[in-house]
Swiss-Prot record:
Its EC number is 4.3.1.17. It comes from Escherichia coli (strain K12). This is L-serine dehydratase TdcG. It catalyses: L-serine = pyruvate + NH4(+). GO terms for biological process: amino acid catabolic process; gluconeogenesis; L-threonine catabolic process to propionate. Binds 1 [4Fe-4S] cluster. Pfam families: SDH_alpha, SDH_beta.
Length: 454
């Protein structure tokens, strides 16, 4: 089973596959080096980046993330404000304190992080980290960042990464999920709660979801109150703060019956801009799509009913179930299947979560998820200048609104759907694999080569 807490992970921007994953890999490697008794013998460490990690690594802060991971930091607890000074110190000195300062290695950044445009054989996001004692190799590990902050060591690639604990309802498809819900008289969130209770206590579950929502809510607050220009060569101005100012001050806008769309846009822009600035966000299921799920829950909170502990849990459990299906049966990596695996999956998850809160049946929840993905099929991942900004930020806003629409369409539907969620997941994966790699997070095609920086 893939837990909802595997799908929703607290980390930092701008990318789950290119920032969170590499930081996790760096931390995993240095922990392995220390536990093997090889740390103090290490003179220097070399990092090789391959494929999409190389081609968009600079714009996604992959190099920074790996350095911070080797230093002993995890995405969920790294002190964001201390990163720039630490990177400057390492760059200037050519020395890297690793394992929380337990040892210092030679690390001339420009020489020891090597960018290779070619891909490793198993996945588009590959990296190899090697520890050396002079000319002697002490330890070398190859990692793949497979989306959503998940990393897989090469020797474990292709193996199941499900939680090994036995759960009462072990589903592997939407069809199985719906049958289990129907037979046991459970909602999707109810079934997921039974599974989560096999892994942790109710108090831990509630506290975990409360923490996830708090980080999302904090991202909205920061994003809609922060002026300025986002980092990087594109000089993209923050838009959420100006939109918020219009929404709270203009009677004309506030009386517009469509103003709810502007609020949803503002929520999504706020979180996505925080992500682009390297702020604290939640993979949902990725950083590139991290604005959609919080925006839809914020919409429900403001315009439908104030959220509480129970509704927050129901939303994340239902959305997490859908995210798990994509993770098991397709991909949530833009480098593997294009943006349909990030924005498309987030839209599908948010539509499912909202339908759950609106009182939809399990079938309606799955239909909302299917509608949302059906109209994201073929969506390319072509970040301009390798930044998670254009088209990513605006795309979050558009698809947050689309998720609400998909939920409403599913709730109002009176005819039986002709396309199942399982079929659209299968189609998404096949479509992504058929895409030219120019459109899979390499910045070699699409908008990425049409928009001029500056």
């Amino acid at each position: 089973m893939i837990s909802a807490f595997d799908i929703f992970k607290i980390g930092i921007g701008p990318s789950s596959s290119h920032t969170v994953g590499p930081m996790n890999a760096g931390k995993s490697f240095i922990d392995r080096l220390e536990s093997s008794g090889l740390l103090t013998a290490t003179s220097h460490i070399v990092v090789d980046l391959y494929g999409s990690l190389s081609l968009t690594g600079k714009g996604h802060a992959t190099d920074v993330a790996i350095i911070m991971g080797l230093a002993g930091n995890s995405p969920q607890d790294v002190v964001i404000d201390e990163i720039p000074a630490f990177i400057e110190l390492v760059t200037r000195s050519g020395r890297l304190p690793v394992a929380s300062g337990a040892h210092i290695v030679d690390f001339p950044v420009a020489k020891n992080i090597i960018f290779h445009p070619e891909m490793l054989p198993r996945h588009e996001n590959g990296m190899r980290i090697t520890a050396w004692k002079g000319q002697e190799e002490l330890l070398s590990k190859t990692y793949y960042s497979v989306g959503g902050g998940f990393i897989v060591e090469e020797e474990h690639f292709g193996l199941s990464h499900d939680v090994e604990t036995s759960v009462p309802y072990d589903f592997h498809s939407a069809g199985e999920l719906l049958k289990m819900c129907d037979y046991n008289g459970l909602s999707i969130s109810g079934l997921m709660m039974h599974n989560e209770l096999a892994l942790r206590s109710k108090a831990e579950i509630d506290a975990g979801f409360a923490r996830i929502w708090q980080v999302m809510h904090d991202g909205i607050e920061r994003g809609m109150n922060t002026e300025g220009v986002l980092p990087g060569p594109l000089n993209v101005p923050r838009r959420a703060v100006a939109l918020r100012r219009q929404l709270v001050s203009s009677d004309n806008i506030s009386n517009d019956p469509m103003n709810v769309i502007d609020w949803i846009n503002m929520y999504a822009l706020a979180v996505s801009e925080e992500n682009a600035a390297g702020g604290r966000v939640v993979t949902a299921p990725t950083n590139g799509a991290c604005g959609i799920i919080p925006a839809v829950l914020a919409y429900y909170d403001k315009f439908r009913r104030p959220v509480n502990e129970r509704s927050i849990a129901r939303y994340f459990l239902a959305a997490g179930a859908i995210g798990a299906l994509y993770k098991m049966n397709a991909s949530i990596s833009g480098a593997e299947v294009g943006c349909q695996g990030e924005i498309g999956v987030a839209c599908s998850m948010a539509a499912a979560g909202l339908t759950e809160l609106l009182g939809g049946s399990p079938a309606q929840v799955c239909n909302a998820a299917e509608i949302a993905m059906e109209h994201n099929l073929g969506l390319t991942c072509d970040p301009v200048a390798g930044q998670v900004q254009i088209p990513c930020i605006e795309r979050n806003a558009i698809n947050a609104v689309k998720a609400v629409n998909a939920a409403r369409m599913a709730m109002r539907r009176t005819s039986a759907p002709r396309v199942s969620l399982d079929k659209v997941i299968e189609t998404m994966y096949e479509t992504g694999k058929d895409m030219n790699d120019k459109y899979r997070e390499t910045s070699r095609g699409g908008l990425a080569i049409k928009v001029v920086c500056g």
